[in-house]
């Protein structure tokens, strides 16, 4: 009997100790979970598909590289189809974020699209480096593109016919240029090209050509003209003194949630942390 009581007491003591140990273990796990939830958000993974403006290539490229460097299991793709095609792509759900180098039109907003201004970019008026012209007024630019002025000598240049280079009808850069210069549906283009790079290349190969392109994409192979006496630069775009400028827009579908990884990229791109990267790419961050 004494042996049985001794064994019973030993069993009770063992169970009590086990219960205490189990309670302590549970508390430890709860604290660990709380710590993880508060201080270590889940890492995002997957692919973000962007589509649209060729003018936004440098800005989106720089933001994508930075985002992927900080999020190892992510990929950001960029399809340089032009602003109009990018807007269509996001409407049709073939990309996460549409890229437009113009503000969305009222009918696009009415169709359910939302614009978020990422940055502002100058539209540079470009000529061949050998062209002696260095400054044009907005009025002169309009007169050149509508065919009212057809010879460079009439604006201080050589005695040569002006060759007008522009973008295709769906281009956001073209929309911005024609809106600012008041030349919508009036331009007498010799060539209508499908990308910023193509315009720069065409102008760089023709001493008599004039074109327009994203300031963020300008290369030494062409010369950017002053407009109304103002040099196109990040500073003059920012202070508004350079008038030929437009927004870089992220287009999304109103009321439709982005995937977690697309939302993370969107939040990063529009945050103050991205401003320096956008500036390095040649544009002025909206934040």
Name each region found by the language model.
Residues 1-4, 8-9:
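Positively charged n-region of N-terminal signal peptides that target proteins for export
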Residues 15-19:
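C-terminal motif of bacterial Sec signal peptides marking the signal peptidase cleavage site
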